[in-house]
Design a protein with these regions (language model features):
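Mid-chain, well-packed structural core segment of small domains
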Residues: 70-106
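Short, charged, surface-exposed secondary-structure boundary motifs
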Residues: 54-57, 71, 107-110, 128-134
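NAD(P)-binding Rossmann-fold cofactor-contacting core
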Residues: 23-27, 35-54
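Glycine-rich, highly charged phosphate/nucleotide-binding loops
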Residues: 1-3, 53-83
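Conserved beta-strand elements of the Class I
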Residues: 17-20
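A short helix->loop->beta-strand "cap" motif at the edges of active sites that frequently abuts
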Residues: 40-42, 92-97, 115-117
Length: 156
């Protein structure tokens, strides 16, 4: 998905983000992307069976065990691991399946879309939020990929 308006709408409407594969290690990309989103008003729910709590929130072993509503499922796992996560996202009634930079499972995205979810692949929620809502700066992960440019106008 490359449509700026759709990405902006997804990030504006999503308030609860379940991060699958979130690490408790501060230096991991999943941690600082989740921390950034939390600091920008999103509720971040951790999904990782290794931990009890991350970023002050209870950590769940799977998406299906999260009580309450999840708007966006953010996937920090290998491409091969995405299909069962997509199935869980469908089962819990999430609105968006978001695959992070380097994660691009077309079959999982197609399955999510067929079930009525929106699907984003190979993009970082932190980078897109910063780019689309005015927070893009020099802090981030050196992926050796320039994946984002400032839009011509900002939605303030």
């Amino acid at each position: 998905m490359d449509d700026i308006n759709t990405l902006r709408r997804i990030l504006r409407e999503s308030r609860v983000i379940a991060v699958v594969g979130l690490s408790a290690d501060w230096y991991r990309p999943s941690y600082f992307a989740a921390k950034y989103m939390q600091e920008h008003g999103y509720r971040v729910v951790s999904v990782n069976p290794k931990y009890g709590e991350i970023l002050g929130e209870k950590c769940y072993p799977s998406l299906r065990e999260i009580p309450g509503k999840v708007d966006l499922v953010d996937v920090f796992r290998k491409t091969a691991d995405v299909m069962p996560i997509a199935e869980d996202a469908i089962a819990i009634g999430a609105k968006v399946l978001w695959q992070q930079l380097g994660v691009k499972n077309e079959a999982a995205a197609a399955k999510a879309r067929a079930a009525g979810l929106e699907a984003v692949m190979d993009r970082c929620v932190k980078i897109e939020h910063g780019r689309l809502f005015g927070g893009l700066n020099w802090v981030g992960v050196n992926t050796h990929i320039i994946s984002a440019k400032r839009p011509r106008w900002l939605a303030y």
